[in-house]
């Protein structure tokens, strides 16, 4: 690989100046050797190394053509394009290697697996899975692709773990058959909602066991979905800490089921409950349950202060198809108030004897997935891909994750050197 200046922003300024170029070049070559067995051909290995180098470089646009032109010359533009769309190598062995290295770097110690989706604005209708759909980054409906991602956060750091491109339901209709073929969407692929994709990936990673997980986290878009939460296969000692919205209802006490005698008509199928559920917003506004000031954790910029309230309650679940409800499992309700008055609501299925300090810690572990997106999009060209095919998207995201792990390793290495 040709020596070049690495992007100091991607390495958060722990690298500064050309003096470290040779050191970082050697470290990168050693790091990428872990992935070389996944590429059967020498040309593939060179193209892989070149592209990762490009993602870590200061190039303004980190897509195929600028990287090829900068590092290898014009004659390598087409080979690098074909490397993404046609080159015969499998992504799964690369992902397995990446997950193993990531787990060794950050995967120890009571961490959280978080799920979230992120969107990529696209022009036109000829990219795999593109449609007008809600784009969280813009807060409105836009023409975009959406990926579902898992991240791990623990005491040793954070990183993206797994991912999948969401293909909207209409893409599986006959109307889209030619476009599916054009974008090389796998023939065996079937529609799955974002929540189904997330649930499947979470259950696979939890079963795999490479990451030491105590928590599963998600934002309210997933936490509001009871089927998603109830379908998680959580090993012993692993619990969800899920954001929900203000309208979520809980029972403050377990309701008795009453069947009043009916003098007329058929007997009642659904019971009358002795108590009704309340919204979590009402709990937040209830003065009899006071807010408490607390230091949630020690952050990089000092203590993280917050106000919070918490209580044991019972989840509220649907009972049939006619708006009847019933009490579910006993859970924690955890509310966090920010300095601007905004309140975040969380439900958690951890046991009653769990110290509340553990809930405080869990409340700080979900933000790193947003940090991963920010670092990968701002510094590593996550959204710079120009491939329209399904395979091109999959490979670009995987290479960005591989580059992100290298940046993480180097930042930690420089931190250790500076502390001695």
Where do the protein language model's features map onto the residues?
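Active-site-proximal, Lys/Arg-enriched surface segment
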Residues: 83-169, 176, 180, 314-322
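Domain-level cores of phosphate- or acyl-group-handling catalytic modules
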Residues: 179-261
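Conserved nucleotidyltransferase catalytic core and NTase-mimicking acidic/glycine-rich helix/loop elements
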Residues: 408-420
């Amino acid at each position: 690989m040709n020596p070049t200046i690495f992007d100091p922003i991607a390495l958060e300024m722990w690298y500064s100046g050309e003096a470290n170029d040779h050191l970082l070049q050697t470290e990168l070559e050693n790091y990428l050797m872990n992935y070389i067995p996944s590429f059967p051909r020498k040309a593939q290995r060179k193209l892989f190394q070149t592209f990762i180098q490009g993602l870590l470089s200061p190039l303004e646009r980190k897509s195929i053509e600028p990287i090829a032109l900068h590092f290898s010359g014009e004659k390598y533009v087409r080979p690098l394009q074909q490397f993404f769309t046609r080159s015969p190598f499998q992504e799964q062995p690369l992902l397995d290697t990446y997950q193993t290295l990531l787990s060794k770097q950050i995967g120890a110690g009571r961490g959280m697996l978080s799920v979230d989706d992120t969107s990529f604005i696209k022009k036109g209708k000829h990219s795999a899975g593109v449609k007008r759909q809600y784009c969280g980054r813009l807060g409105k409906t836009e023409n975009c692709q959406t990926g579902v991602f898992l991240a791990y956060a623990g005491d040793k750091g954070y990183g993206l773990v797994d991912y999948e491109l969401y293909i909207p339901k209409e893409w599986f209709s006959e109307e889209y058959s030619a476009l599916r073929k054009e974008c090389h969407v796998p023939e065996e692929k079937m529609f799955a909602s974002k929540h189904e994709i997330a649930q499947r990936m979470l259950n696979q990673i939890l079963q795999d066991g490479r990451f030491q997980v105590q928590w599963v986290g998600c934002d309210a878009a997933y936490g509001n979905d009871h089927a998603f939460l109830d379908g998680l296969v959580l090993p012993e000692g692993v619990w969800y800490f899920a954001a929900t919205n203000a309208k979520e209802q809980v029972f403050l006490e377990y309701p008795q089921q009453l069947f009043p005698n009916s003098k007329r008509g058929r007997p009642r199928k659904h019971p009358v409950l002795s108590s009704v559920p309340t919204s979590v917003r009402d709990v937040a506004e209830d003065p009899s349950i006071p807010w408490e000031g607390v230091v949630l954790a020690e952050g990089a910029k000092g203590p993280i202060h917050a106000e919070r309230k918490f209580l044991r309650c019972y989840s509220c679940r649907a009972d049939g198809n006619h708006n009847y409800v019933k009490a579910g499992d006993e859970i924690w309700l955890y509310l966090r108030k920010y300095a601007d008055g905004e309140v975040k609501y969380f439900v958690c299925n951890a046991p009653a004897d769990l110290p509340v300090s553990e809930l405080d810690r869990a409340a700080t572990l979900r933000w790193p997935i947003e940090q991963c997106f920010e670092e990968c999009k701002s510094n590593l060209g996550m959204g710079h891909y120009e491939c329209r095919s399904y395979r091109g998207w999959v490979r670009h995201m995987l290479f960005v994750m591989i580059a992100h792990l290298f940046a993480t390793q180097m930042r930690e290495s420089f931190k250790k050197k500076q502390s001695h």
